[in-house]
Amino acid sequence: MDVPIHVIRYFCVLAEELHFGRAAERLSITPPSLSQQISRLEQQLDVKLFDRSPRKVELTSYGRALLPLARRVQDDHDQLLSWGRSV
């Protein structure tokens, strides 16, 4: 299974915003594109990460469990890029 780093970022931002429109705006993508990427991630992991309703978005227990791991991956990736720029 290969999960691109940008999808991990999408997950983290949506988990922070809990709103597809605001998260998509922060990520400079469209809400439908964000929704599609999150759905693909859920399919890859075979778990539901967000409960979606017309009025709100909430993390599921799986989403809450994944969030610290995803943030760590994102931070490690950022450090790797920073190190690469400094050498």
Question: What role is predicted for each listed range?
Answer:
Residues 1-37, 53, 66:
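N-terminal short secondary-structure element
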Residues 38, 54-56, 71-74:
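Short, structured secondary-structure boundary patches
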Residues 44-45, 66-87:
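Alpha-helical linker/hinge and terminal dimerization helices associated
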Residues 42-59:
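A short LG(V/I)-centered, amphipathic sequence patch enriched
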Residues 6, 58, 79:
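Short, conserved clusters of charged catalytic residues that mark active-site
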